Amino acid sequence: MNLYLIRHGESQSNYDNKYNRAYYCGQLDVPLTEKGVESAKQLKPYFYNIKINDVYVSDLTRTKETYQYIFPYDIPTTVTSLLRERSLGLFEGQFKDKLMKNNMYHRYFHDPNYKDFRHSFIQKAPEGESYNDVYYRVKQ
């Protein structure tokens, strides 16, 4: 059995964080950009001669769009929230520069025990998930 893992194409959030004011996306439901659509379409030929038995995709728009551009034909597909990206809780949709100045969240950007929440396996944003939480969610 072969397992293929595909990340969604460039999302509007990816674009915004690169070229506009940066914010935390997490599980916000954002679409693909034109570049993201083109990236997904470029993967389509790779799978022409590969028999795909099942597809599992998160319920977020960016992942469903990526899937539709790669696999436009009928394949048994499971759409599930269990495959969503890590939740960033109260930080989702918030501008990073604004959060960094908010005294209520000071520790998440300045305290060594908390500030690694973006990369740590155990730390998390307030009301969000750690990577450990994601592991157990996906394992279901």
Features from the language model and the residues they span:
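Active-site-proximal alpha-helix that buttresses catalytic centers in soluble enzyme cores
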Residues: 9-78
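Extreme N-terminal starter segment of soluble prokaryotic enzymes
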Residues: 1-4, 54
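Generic beta-structure capping elements
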Residues: 6-9, 82
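Short glycine/serine/threonine-biased micro-segments
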Residues: 7, 24, 34, 87, ...
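Short beta->alpha linker loops
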Residues: 58-62, 83, 137
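Phosphate-handling substructures
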Residues: 71-136
